From Swiss-Prot:
Protein name: Serine--tRNA ligase 1
Subunit structure: Homodimer. The tRNA molecule binds across the dimer.
Residues reported in the UniProt entry to bind L-serine: T231, A232, E233, E285, S384
Function: Catalyzes the attachment of serine to tRNA(Ser). Is also able to aminoacylate tRNA(Sec) with serine, to form the misacylated tRNA L-seryl-tRNA(Sec), which will be further converted into selenocysteinyl-tRNA(Sec).
Pfam families the record matches: Seryl_tRNA_N, tRNA-synt_2b
SUPFAM superfamilies reported for this sequence: Class II aaRS and biotin synthetases, tRNA-binding arm
Pathway named in the protein's UniProt entry: Aminoacyl-tRNA biosynthesis; selenocysteinyl-tRNA(Sec) biosynthesis; L-seryl-tRNA(Sec) from L-serine and tRNA(Sec): step 1/1
Length: 423
C-alpha cells in the first residue's frame, strides 16, 4: 500500500511514476477527488459533533435551571441525524478510496529503468561463458524422460497438464538441489531456516500484495478463507504481520523450502513442456526485514546470495534490472537472475530479488521502533534462492553428455551418496 500522505504531498511525482507502471492518470485523479471529498466530510462531521456537544451543554444547563429545552433537543436530534448521514457517506467514500488504493502498484525506485515491458530491462552483469557442445544439446524433458527420472505423461494422467513425477535419481537430484540451497543460505549467508504453513488466509495474501488484484493466479480452497501459497514469500513476510519489532533486531533473514502452487492464468501456449512453468514446484525462498536506510544494501546482498548458488553449481547466468513495466506489483526494484538453457540457446529467469520498501509492510502492518523510539514501517525484501525445478532443468541441460548421461555437479555429489553421473 502506498503512503497516502506522500501521494497528497507529491501528486505530480506520484502520478508520473505510476504512469511508468501502466496506471492511467485518471485513476489517481479519481482517488484524490474521492479522498478530498472524504476529508472534507470528516471536517464537516467534526464541526457538527462540536456543535452537538455545545447544544448538549446548553440542554444540561436549561434542565438544571428547570427551563424548557425542547428547541435545543430538537436541534440536537437534527444534528445527530446529519452526522449519521454524513458518517455513512464517509464510509462509502472510504470504501471507494480503499478499492483504488489496494490496486495501485508500488512506486519504482529512481534507479529502475523506465519502460513498458521486458524490452526495457537492463543487463547488469554476466557470470561465466555458456559451454560449447560438440553435439546438439537436448531439452531437459527429453533427457529426463530418456533417463527415466522425469515422468510428465503420468503426471498429466493423474493431475493434468503442467504436473509431473520426479522418479528415482530425478527425485534424489531435486532433493539434493534444495538441500544444498538451504545449507548455503543457512551456513554461508546467515539466514534462519523456517518451515512455514503452505495454506494461508486472505489477510496474508493481501499483506504481500497478491490479493485482491491477482486472485485468478492462485488456487483457493473452496468454501474457505485459505489459499495454497504461490510462494513462501507470503507466509515468511507475514510472520511479523501486525507486529512492532525493535530496530536492534534488524535486519532479519528468513529462508524456506516450500511447494509453490500457481494457476498460470494467461500462460496458455507458453512453456508447455518441461520444468519451466508448472502448477506445482519447489522453491527455496529468501525474505528479509530491514530498516529504510539499509534495504538497498540488503537487496544487493540477496541478489549475490542467489548468484552464489548458481556459481557453485557452475551454471552460467546473467543479472538484469527489470523495467518499471516488467516489475511485480509490490516491488520498488527487482533484479532477475537468468540461467543459461542450452537447448533454447537463451537465458531464462531462475530468481527474482525485490525490494518492496515499505509497500508490503503498510499492508501487513509490519513495523519497528527506531533508536529514537518512533515507530516506522519496515522494508521487506524477497527473492528466489532458487526455483528448484528450473535449477534441475538447467543442470540436466548444461551437464548433459553426448551419450545421454548427465554429470552431477561436484557440490551436489555429497547429497547424492557420492554419485558422479546419472545414467
Amino acid at each position: 500500500m502506498l503512503d497516502m500522505k506522500k501521494i497528497r504531498q507529491n501528486v505530480e511525482v506520484v502520478q508520473k511514476k505510476l504512469k511508468t507502471r501502466g496506471v492511467d492518470e485518471e485513476v489517481l485523479l479519481r482517488f484524490l477527488a474521492l479522498d478530498e471529498g472524504r476529508r472534507a466530510l470528516l471536517v464537516k462531521v467534526e464541526e457538527l459533533k462540536k456543535h452537538r456537544n455545545q447544544v448538549s451543554g446548553e440542554i444540561a444547563q436549561l434542565k438544571r435551571a428547570q427551563k424548557d429545552a425542547s428547541q435545543q433537543l430538537l436541534n440536537m436530534q437534527e444534528v445527530s441525524e446529519q452526522i449519521k448521514v454524513l458518517d455513512q457517506e464517509v464510509v462509502h467514500l472510504q470504501e471507494q478510496c480503499t478499492a483504488i488504493a489496494e490496486r495501485l502498484p508500488n512506486l519504482p525506485h529512481e534507479s529502475v529503468p523506465v519502460g513498458a515491458d521486458e524490452a526495457a530491462n537492463v543487463e547488469v552483469r554476466r557470470w561465466s561463458t555458456p559451454k560449447t557442445f560438440s553435439f546438439e544439446p537436448k531439452p531437459h524433458w527429453e533427457i529426463g524422460e530418456a533417463l527415466g527420472i522425469l515422468d510428465f505423461e503420468r503426471g498429466a494422467k493423474v493431475s493434468g497438464s503442467r504436473f509431473l513425477y520426479y522418479k528415482g535419481l530425478g527425485a534424489r537430484l531435486e532433493r539434493a538441489v534444495y538441500n544444498f540451497m538451504l545449507d548455503q543460505h543457512v551456513n554461508e549467508h546467515g539466514y534462519t531456516e523456517v518451515i512455514p504453513p503452505y495454506l494461508v488466509n486472505s489477510k496474508a495474501m493481501f499483506g504481500t500484495g497478491q490479493f485482491p488484484k491477482f486472485k485468478e493466479d492462485v488456487f483457493q480452497v473452496a468454501e474457505s478463507d485459505l489459499t495454497l501459497i504461490p510462494t513462501a514469500e507470503v507466509p515468511l513476510t507475514n510472520y511479523y504481520n501486525n507486529e512492532i519489532l525493535d530496530a536492534q533486531e534488524l535486519p532479519i533473514y528468513f529462508t524456506a523450502l516450500s511447494p509453490s502452487f500457481r494457476s498460470e492464468a494467461g500462460s496458455a501456449g507458453r512453456d508447455t513442456r518441461g520444468l519451466i512453468r508448472l502448477h506445482q514446484f519447489h522453491k527455496v525462498e529468501m525474505v528479509k526485514f530491514s530498516d529504510a536506510e539499509h534495504s538497498y544494501e540488503e537487496l544487493e546482498k540477496m541478489t549475490n546470495n542467489a548468484g552464489d548458488i548458481l556459481e557453485k553449481l557452475g551454471l552460467p547466468y546473467r543479472v538484469i534490472t527489470l523495467s518499471t513495466g516488467d516489475m511485480g506489483f509490490s516491488a520498488a526494484k527487482t533484479y532477475d537472475l537468468e540461467v543459461w538453457i542450452p537447448a533454447q540457446k537463451t537465458y531464462r529467469e531462475i530468481s527474482s530479488c525485490s525490494n518492496c520498501e515499505d509497500f508490503q509492510a503498510r499492508r501487513a502492518l509490519i513495523r519497528y521502533r527506531d533508536k529514537t523510539g518512533h515507530v516506522q514501517y519496515a522494508h521487506t525484501l524477497n527473492g528466489s534462492g532458487l526455483a528448484v525445478g528450473r535449477t534441475v532443468a538447467a543442470i540436466l541441460e548444461n551437464y548433459q553428455n553426448e551419450d545421454g548421461t548427465v554429470t552431477i555437479p561436484e557440490v551436489l555429489r555429497p547429497y547424492m551418496g557420492g554419485l558422479t553421473k546419472i545414467d
